Amino acid sequence: MLKNKILATTLSVSLLAPLANPLLENAKAANDTEEIGKGSDIEIIKRTEDKTSNKWGVTQNIQFDFVKDKKYNKDALILKMQGFISSRTTYYNYKKTNHVKAMRWPFQYNIGLKTNDKYVSLINYLPKNKIESTNVSQTLGYNIGGNFQSAPSLGGNGSFNYSKSISYTQQNYVSEVEQQNSKSVLWGVKANSFATESGQKSAFDSDLFVGYKPHSKDPRDYFVPDSELPPLVQSGFNPSFIATVSHEKGSSDTSEFEITYGRNMDVTHAIKRSTHYGNSYLDGHRVHNAFVNRNYTVKYEVNWKTHEIKVKGQN
């Protein structure tokens, strides 16, 4: 398990000074102090928390950016959710049979944020809507007075006093918001379509990933080699998502947030069959959402006064 770490950074931002290039954002998160401009209209106080679960094959790297704005009548917090979700793709004999092999693989990756605090409201998040592009890059910007806006790419930050960016790769998958309200947001990164040797196939195709070696005893050989699998199936997914929340000043000192990373798994069966002439071939069969919500959830406590982050529980 990765060692928990608390990272504190205070930024002084003037009304006129925009944030420096967000492409360097991840590196800057490791610095002790960063100052921009000479004023102190905004303070950005940063904390980082890492949690890993070997049981679920998940690492959460969460950046908590407290926005202290003298011209905003609420507390604000930007949560950037990064880390790694292992694919947990596995191959095995189906019910100890010799002619049916199975491949369990992630049809969907789940990323979610939730709070039950009545004084906290979700005010912005990234990504929004449905995104089909392989490479996703977006920026959330902040201006004095509590104004959060999103920009389509890493270069769209020039007019912001402070900004936070996301960037991730989702080859053969699409991102979309599945649920969203004032207390929560849930994203699904879902399998879409795949280029195969026999042409383009839908993520729901029963023969997807079925291979060409019906005489092998190894379950792995019943399916296509690693070179034909996209990274999100072969290894896993590196999320990069943002949610921004507001908190009523003078209400509760602390709030709790549940952050969830996980996956929904499909199972593809490769069944050895024979033609009338005795030739063997593999036939595919799919079980969609065979294992759902295989999720790792961590409960974080945020202190609005001291800006401390505590882990209150995990499954």
From Swiss-Prot:
Transmembrane segments: none annotated. Residues 1-29 form the signal peptide. SUPFAM superfamilies: Leukocidin-like (SSF56959). Pfam families: Leukocidin. GO terms for cellular component: extracellular region. GO terms for biological process: cytolysis in another organism. Coiled coil: none annotated. One of its GO terms (molecular function) is toxin activity. Keywords: Cytolysis, Hemolysis, Signal, Toxin, Virulence. The keyword Signal applies. Belongs to the aerolysin family. Toxicity requires sequential binding and synergistic association of a class S and a class F component which form heterooligomeric complexes. HlgC (class S) associates with HlgB (class F) thus forming an CB toxin. Toxin that seems to act by forming pores in the membrane of the cell. Has a hemolytic and a leucotoxic activity. NCBIfam families: hlyII. This is Gamma-hemolysin component C. It comes from Staphylococcus aureus (strain MSSA476). The lineage of its organism: Bacteria, Bacillati, Bacillota, Bacilli, Bacillales.
